[in-house]
């Protein structure tokens, strides 16, 4: 995204005293917020809240999370899911025959390097758009590109991540038979990912209900002063400055208690083909899967 790229080109900030750099970060967050609100206001004013994209952007502005129902048809989603599962067949199973957490395994697909993360019965295969033209087309339609332009001020293409989590019912050599019965979760702790407004999309390849682990979001949490401290700390740490107290990426227990009282915690259940949009300043986490399987495709920007 545009602001992220600008920040990455400002290493000189690391050479400044912390007392000088901190106010700069406060101003960056302030102006990002101001122009983000302005962009959404103009789009909604022109196209209205009855427009699917307009409604989604309006919901994002208010709560930090939105769902566009039936963004993809059942046939389209089934094709995507089939292709995702097909990629599991190409994994180096001998390297996956372990009970240990695999954080960042390099795997080759058609000469391209992809990354794999596995924890228990959950796998993330990262970089599917590098594999073939089928995946490269995903997330490049007009509606998705328009949302990306409004939110990020650029035409960047999504980084695709396939995530499968199951209770043992999904039989495949990519999952060792010796796993414990507990279902561990990748990204299972409440956290915020960004200090400036940035989107992540979740495409539901199957229905995601209470039993198979929906993403949990704290509505309006990004607008709370307690969480804004986390946003500032993320920027401080990005430029190698000491963070203020209260946490940065992860939300500590004290703030969680605060959120339970002040924010509306929702389990973002979605149907197959729905597209969930999440502002990464919002506190969220992956809830434990109780039974069944969960297949989702993440779009990272």
Please annotate each region the language model reported.
Residues 175, 192-194, 203-207, 219:
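Short, structured patches in soluble enzyme cores that scaffold and shape functional sites
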Residues 187-195, 283-286:
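Histidine-centered catalytic micro-motifs
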Residues 1-25:
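Compositionally biased, charge-rich terminal segments
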Residues 215, 286-295:
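Short conserved catalytic/interaction loops centered on acidic-Pro-aromatic/His motifs
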Residues 17-62, 69-188:
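Non-heme Fe(II)-dependent double-stranded beta-helix
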